[in-house]
Amino acid sequence: MKLSKKVAFIAAVTSSFILSSSPAFAGQINGSGATFAQPIIDVCKVEFTKDTGHTVNYTAGGSGKGRTDFFNNLVDFGASDAAYTSGFPAHLEYAPVYAAPIAIGYNLPTVKTPIYLSPAVIAQIFSGEITNWNDIRIRTVNDGEVKVPVFATKKITVKVAGKNVTRTIPVLDAKGLPKITKYNVVDANPNLPNVPVTVYFRSDSSGTSEQFLKFLKGANDGANKELWPKTATGTFSNSTPVPLSNFFNFQGANGSALVAAGVKSKVGGIGYGEVSWFADNKLPTALVQNWAGEFVAPSSAGTSAFLGGGTINANGSLDTPYQKAIPGAYSIGTASYGLVYPESAKKDPEKQKIVAAWHTYLLEQCPKKFPEKGYTLITGALYDKAKAQIAKIK
């Protein structure tokens, strides 16, 4: 009799715990925007549903589409790699919850060693000035010794699909910046072929394009400013030094997935996009020279180092320093933003709770669960700002 009562008590307590651990309701939120964020959203929303019971629907139509849909109140949240420059919504907060490198992927099957590119050469390729892979300007950068940082890493255990898995992530110092264990001095000598360059670019309104164009202008400002004099916009073809109609070797594509697919389809192809799109297509990516003279691969650690030198604005957006000597910095790293409604928008408070929980999950859990996607675990002052912005979602 006593045993039966004890079992009944345990069952009641267990049932109460399960109920209290479950969400009060299972809700659904809808988002729209950047293809830059799509790889991490696609894998992480499944885990979010398992952990919370809530469903996230996301349509990746580009940052411009996300900003438009958010402005028109068609979604519960947006995602954009760039801030609004006009047509501001009446109620808006930026939550910097995504960060990753914009990689330069290429298709040169005969080249078996990494390719190294300087900001000047990248500008000359994407402006149409360099049209062949064995151009002397590319060969000069890839001739001789280059300095490459090696970042410290550690293994952690996280739960994915209900199972404990081991992941490798960068080791951070007290300031939240990645630790560099050493520098490798590499003899750069790829056998660059006599193959025409075909440039794949985003033809849609794209925050990824805008951030890439900011790099092309910012990193070449000063002595090389003539290489990329135009101000960055979300439309690549509107921001090139010379109209693309002057060239036969430029191919537009709608979205990062199609840019990467285009590069894969053409020997000699080159394009830009979030690093996982090229990894998924088994394409190599270039190491990019930073202002300290180092050549850095597109990685979460290099992105973290670069963003750590940026200036955080009051609205949650970030200005990045292209001409600042930051050890280990990958200079085409970018923060990307959740577009969210603050309390003043008077949105459904229950949905707002889900939006806040989703952005917290993106900020704190997703990069650790899926480091292979290349996204940076945001830390330090930018993390604090992201948390403060998320707290405004009510």
Question: Where on the chain are the PLM-derived regions?
Answer:
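Bacterial N-terminal signal peptides that target proteins for export
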Residues: 1-10
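Cleavable N-terminal signal peptides
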Residues: 11-14, 24
